């Protein structure tokens, strides 16, 4: 998906659109935790390793991203906290019973 996004970003810049291409790594979830555990590493250590590999690969492929962000970045965490607080304050987050597929 990053290569496709890069293609779109390059095209958008070529036709004169103001373009900001953000990419990065999602470092949360059970898969990351399990992969770290099987390697005898902490989740953060494993995320650091994998994120570094992705960033190096994107640089090698000359991906034209403007910013590489990780879900473990302090900046990202702060942004998520602000967004969730706004949703909570508006009443968009609440406890209830849910019926559905997920």
Give the location of each predicted region.
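N-terminal, positively charged nucleic-acid-binding surface of large information/translation enzymes
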Residues: 1-102
């Amino acid at each position: 998906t990053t290569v496709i996004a890069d293609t779109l970003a390059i095209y958008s810049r070529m036709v004169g659109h103001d373009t900001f291409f953000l990419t990065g790594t999602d470092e949360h979830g059970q898969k990351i935790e399990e992969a770290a555990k099987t390697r005898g590493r902490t989740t953060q250590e494993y995320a650091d390793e994998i994120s570094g590999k992705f960033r190096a690969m994107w640089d090698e492929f000359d991906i034209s991203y403007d910013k590489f962000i990780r879900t473990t970045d302090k900046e990202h965490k702060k942004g998520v906290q602000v967004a969730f607080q706004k949703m909570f304050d508006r009443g968009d987050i609440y406890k209830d019973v849910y019926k559905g597929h997920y």
